[in-house]
Amino acid sequence: MDSDSHNTLQTVNTFLTHLASERRLSPHTVNGYQRDLIEARTLLGSQPWDTLTVHDMRSLAASLHRQGKSGKTIQRMLSTLRTFFRYLMREGLARDNPAIDIRAPKSGKRLPKALDVDQVSHLLDAGTSNSEPLALRDQAIMELLYACGLRLAELLSLNLDSIDLHESQLLVTGKGNKTRQLPVGKPALTAVRRWLQVRPMLIKSSDQNALFISKNGRRLSPSSVQQRLKRHALERGLDAHLHPHKLRHSFATHLLESSGDLRAVQELLGHADLATTQVYTHLDFQHLAQVYDGAHPRAQRRKDDDE
């Protein structure tokens, strides 16, 4: 085995291509793998991948710990390396996986703070009078993030045919390319309809099917949404650190507090917990829609309300 042949940037690039094309991971996730591998390579030095040992992996984890990295960050790095070494073994470029049994120090689980219902209402209701195209787009984005508990990557991957305005439903592609069907409340539907009326003003290419586009007619980037959300939060006197995942967490918190139905909430969130996924698959859409209608502060998705 030629150690140098896979100890190059090309090997890492090939692995990243594999993640994007074969495993169909989002660009954001692939970039995370890339950052982890670059940092690991820096800390491990020039030693070929196939000569690294369990001791090297423990030393890497210890080095990250000394740098003050959290247990979660170290575990993510080790997870990246385990995945990378599995790929190398599959390609015949490594004999074993030295990261397989290495565990990072446990860190306490800290959930992001949720906005309360009044704060969410202030955030969303304050922008309903602005008819500028970008403002209408941002309003639809914020409404959907909270109405459906979307991950940022899920929001950005939405296409025009992802939402059924008549049936008040959204088809979302989540982690692992898994799809789920979500009910959508009246305020979010109204916001999306208003956005779709002005969306043609920003279109530069007739084949652009992204639901949310930039002022240049391209599919929105994660940083654009994050920056716009922070801007709207500041304008409305809310936490400057407001980010898309905080709206997702607020969605989950408010539904769980109102319904107490943990299984339905986790199904709506698209969580893929190996220990509990089988339970969630038995919940049908009608049950999820009923939980949503009865518990979500901005639901009201009955057909007669939509007229």
Swiss-Prot record:
CDD domains: INT_XerDC_C (cd00798)
PROSITE patterns reported in the protein's UniProt record: CB, TYR_RECOMBINASE
Core-binding (CB) domain location: 6-89
Active site: 151, 175, 245, 248, 271, 280 (o-(3'-phospho-dna)-tyrosine intermediate)
Localization per record: Cytoplasm
Source superkingdom: Bacteria
Gene3D superfamilies in alphabetical order: 1.10.150.130, Intergrase catalytic core
Entry GO terms, CC: cytoplasm
Domain Tyr recombinase, chain residue ranges per copy: 110-293
Any one GO molecular function term: tyrosine-based site-specific recombinase activity
Pfam short name (any one): Phage_integrase
Signal sequence annotation: none
InterPro entries: CB, DNA_brk_join_enz, Integrase-like_cat_sf, Integrase_catalytic, Integrase_recombinase_N, Integrase_SAM-like_N, Recomb_XerC, Tyrosine_recombinase_XerC/XerD
Protein keywords: Cell cycle, Cell division, Chromosome partition, Cytoplasm, DNA integration, DNA recombination, DNA-binding
BP-aspect Gene Ontology terms: cell division; chromosome segregation; DNA transposition
Family assignment from sequence similarity: Belongs to the 'phage' integrase family. XerC subfamily.
Function: Site-specific tyrosine recombinase, which acts by catalyzing the cutting and rejoining of the recombining DNA molecules. The XerC-XerD complex is essential to convert dimers of the bacterial chromosome into monomers to permit their segregation at cell division. It also contributes to the segregational stability of plasmids.
Subunit structure: Forms a cyclic heterotetrameric complex composed of two molecules of XerC and two molecules of XerD.
Name of the protein this chain belongs to: Tyrosine recombinase XerC
Source organism: Alcanivorax borkumensis (strain ATCC 700651 / DSM 11573 / NCIMB 13689 / SK2)
Record lineage: Bacteria, Pseudomonadati, Pseudomonadota, Gammaproteobacteria, Oceanospirillales
